[in-house]
A protein has these predicted regions:
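Interdomain regulatory linker/hinge segments that flank or connect interaction modules
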Residues: 1-15
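Structured functional modules or segments
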Residues: 63-97
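A structural signal for short beta-strand/turn segments enriched in small hydrophobics and glycine
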Residues: 51-66
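Glycine- and charge-enriched low-complexity intrinsically disordered segments
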Residues: 92-119
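Short histidine-centered loop motifs in beta-beta connectors
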Residues: 38-53, 73, 83-84
Length: 126
């Protein structure tokens, strides 16, 4: 897998989630290649329902992969306004194209200005 990290994205390195600012407070989320590499091939992916509130650091979904099963942790607080149906139906897309067809959801962030300060513009750990 190609471990590239586009510079126009923000990263939450602890849980390997990338964030793309789409407009205003709308943020597209996905799993970064390092996270995918450590998970192995995804077999199952579930996200909280549309319009559900998520809190930074809390579960926004569940995933099952070759190397682990666990919760998908939200990097930001807000509401899920869009879910990637194709990735939910075929989680392998997340492995194959994490920045393209494998994105997870779009969150309407409650306070991007404050919460984005805790994200990185490269995946380097603290």
């Amino acid at each position: 897998m190609d471990l590239t990290f586009p510079k126009h994205l923000y990263y939450e390195p602890e849980h390997h989630v990338w964030c793309l600012v789409e407009s205003d407070q709308k943020i597209r989320l996905g799993i970064d290649p390092l996270g995918i590499s450590s998970l192995g091939e995804l077999a199952y992916l579930s996200l909280n329902p549309l319009e559900s509130k998520v809190r930074k650091g809390q579960a926004m979904g569940v995933l099952e992969a070759a190397k682990m099963t666990g919760e998908l942790i939200a990097p930001l607080s807000g509401s899920i306004i869009k879910r990637n149906r194709e990735a939910l139906e075929d989680p392998y897309q997340v492995n194959q194209d994490p920045y393209g067809k494998g994105w997870l959801c779009v969150i309407e962030c409650e306070d991007w200005e404050t919460e984005s300060c805790l994200l990185y513009t490269s995946p380097s750990p603290r």
